[in-house]
Amino acid sequence: MGDFVIDLIAATLRIATPLIFATLGELFCERAGILNLGIEGTMFFGAFSGFTAASLSGSLWVGVLTALVGGMLSGWLMSLFSVRLGVNQHVSGLGITLLMTALSLFGFRVIFGENRILPSIEPFKQLSIFPNNPVLGPIFSQYALTYIAIALVPIVWWIVFRTNFGLNLRSVGDNPEATDAAGINVYRLRTIALIIGGGLMAVGGSFLSVAQLGSFTFGIVAGRGWVCIALIIFGNWH
């Protein structure tokens, strides 16, 4: 029974890793007053771009950084449509999801062809912090990205709730008119929030391809983006 509980906790941390990244990204967006429904497509694009860059470069970290940049681009596109052009958030978000998904599928077929055998890479190795501890050893034998995701939770909380940037961000989300009257650039803050959020979402997607699976499949994200939106609501936007 003890081994089962230990293995369950360890597996929970691994499974939660992409959800943590993407949920933190969505938190930035929603605290700025933007419901980013492009999260599913951004995660999918992160999985594709991360796997492709890692496969072509031979470096898993290059894959993660490529996914980060690609996600930031997705966030910028979302800001262009929903913030600058005033397109309905739901329409622009779903449009981003469709666009990023289509680009990923098209790019994958162009680069890797349509072979029945999916290409694969050597994924991240698990890092054990307590290798000689029978309880903590299995729990803290995780991927580097898992440790980064866990560390980001208090960091993001501090940024959002304990800094001037976070105060302005929450003000933009709660009352953009009053924030604008106070001389704060609402467009700029929302754009920054969407870019940061998109980057985190894509890194969450890249975890699936460069750490968990070592491959890319068309159903790799499997609705995790929508789960993250639900987690934001259940967590009361904290």
Report residues per predicted region.
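Hydrophobic alpha-helical transmembrane segments
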Residues: 9-12, 41, 61-69, 90-94, ...
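Short, non-helical or kinked segments that cap or interrupt transmembrane helices
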Residues: 28-46, 83-96, 168, 192, ...
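Alpha-helical transmembrane segments within multi-pass membrane transporters and channels
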Residues: 58-103
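Small-residue faces within membrane-embedded alpha-helices
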Residues: 12, 16-23, 44, 67, ...
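Helix-loop-helix "hairpin" substructures at the membrane interface of multi-pass membrane proteins
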Residues: 138-216
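Transmembrane helix-bundle core of multi-pass membrane transporters
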Residues: 100-162
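Transmembrane alpha-helical segments in multi-pass inner-membrane proteins
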Residues: 201, 215-238
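Membrane-interfacial amphipathic/re-entrant helices at transmembrane-helix boundaries
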Residues: 1-22, 35, 49, 56-62
